[in-house]
Amino acid sequence: MPRPNSHSPGFMRIVLAPTIAVMFLACFAASAQTTIFLDGRVATMQALDKITARISTLSAPVGESRQFGTLEVTVQRCAFHPPEETPENAAFVVIRDLGYDQSVAPAEVFSGWMFSSSPAISALEHPVYDITLLACSAD
């Protein structure tokens, strides 16, 4: 039996068609998986003062503000994976810089999602402070 070459129609049926079908099914199966997040009530964050090299842990309940230096940190939503899933925590955080001058309006320096698994991508980078999400919890 002659061996099909890459230009023959037999090559498409024998080699490429099953390969394409497997790739399609793998993509479909990956998109069918659902990710479960549980609502959290408290976000635990790590705050670094770059001037003094002081590292602090902030516990911020959802809907309440906490202050670190001149920053006001407000967690608007907090969620985490259940224990049987891959560890991941997410929080929607708004951070405002109050500054030292009371006559100047506070400036919003961060508004968005922070993820504990990707601190380099989703952390606040400020000239004086860094803030990253450590965890979200139900209590």
Where are these regions (language model features)?
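N- and C-terminal low-complexity/disordered segments
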Residues: P2-N5, P9-I14, A30-D139
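Bacterial N-terminal signal peptides
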Residues: A17-C27
